[in-house]
Amino acid sequence: MAHEFVRPRKARPGDHLAVLSPSFAAPGAYPGIHEQAMRRLADLTGLVPVEYPTTRQVGASAAARAADINAAFADPQVRGILAVIGGDDQITVIPHLDGDLARADPKPFLGTSDNTNLHHWLCGLGIASFYGGSSQVHLGPGPAVDDIHVRSLRAALLTGERLEITDPGESEDIGIDWADPQALKSFGEREPTEPWSWYGPPRAVTGPTWGGCLEVIQWILTAGRFPFSPEALHGGVLIIETSEELLPAREVGWIVRSLGERGFLSAVDAVLVARPPVSDHTRRPPAADRARLREQQRDTVVDVVSRYNPEAVVCVGVPFGHTKPQWILPHGGPITVDGVERRIFADYR
């Protein structure tokens, strides 16, 4: 990848961790889940979660949310930033941010979904981040935090080791409604996962990642906020996933095709596609239909990628998106996609 990234230094136990709501302020709507998430976060990391004025303020303005992000970067005691959840309007927050503050004191940022906006903003500043980690989804609900999430959370914030990305063997599309007290104690309905699907030549690729939630990437490109030419992704690893909006496979294919027409697909050496959610609280097809929907998205994406870059190593099914358990992955940091051994390794330095 032609663009070099700064990797922020790790936090240490006792440091402050900013907990922000750059999109939807889920802690204000569902405080019980949030408070359990904060207790678990402190126990698992030894860090001190610090909330800001809009962390629990549902409906806060874009400028107010941006002020909290700027304040977190400006505070030398804060050694990491965690977004509680995504949403659908973070694109309006980005113009209010002060890039000089982030450049002056880069910090690990973790978030998923709509936080793709912040990841790409940091990318434009030359700062690596970590895709995943929404506390309201992965730390607060259920009887405990999933092992793969704990390991990648600690690696991203504290330890910086190299981890093999493996399949947890089970997955859920959606948890119990957070308004239900049972959400504090139980996971959603989980089902066995399928083996990951591999395509492309049998070769090993190592490169920095770029990507995020596919729908949000489309917004960012439409707004003209990708700061480099597609050639800047040369040799990199594209990571893409789809949201709880449950886009039909053909619409997913249209977005991926647009990436191809922009030159992104031909630039990268590998593509990781997350296991997609195919159900929610109101739409729960039978198991066979859910499997078919996942297969349709897989086949559509692989077909489009292969047209633009038949030499790309492609792996489909990796749980780094909107399903749970979730791996947090580097964004701007290196990942090895080994098409020979069919293994994936992520470097969290």
Regions found by a protein language model. Give the residues of each.
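Internal helical hairpin/lid segments
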Residues: 222-296
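N-terminal glycine-rich "phosphate-gripper" loop used for MgATP/nucleotide binding
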Residues: 82-91, 112
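A short helix->loop->beta-strand "cap" motif at the edges of active sites that frequently abuts
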Residues: 77, 102-108, 127, 268-269, ...
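Conserved beta-alpha junction segments in alpha/beta enzyme cores
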Residues: 22, 29-37, 197-240, 245
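ATP/nucleoside-binding phosphotransfer catalytic cores, i.e., glycine-rich phosphate-binding loops
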Residues: 269-349
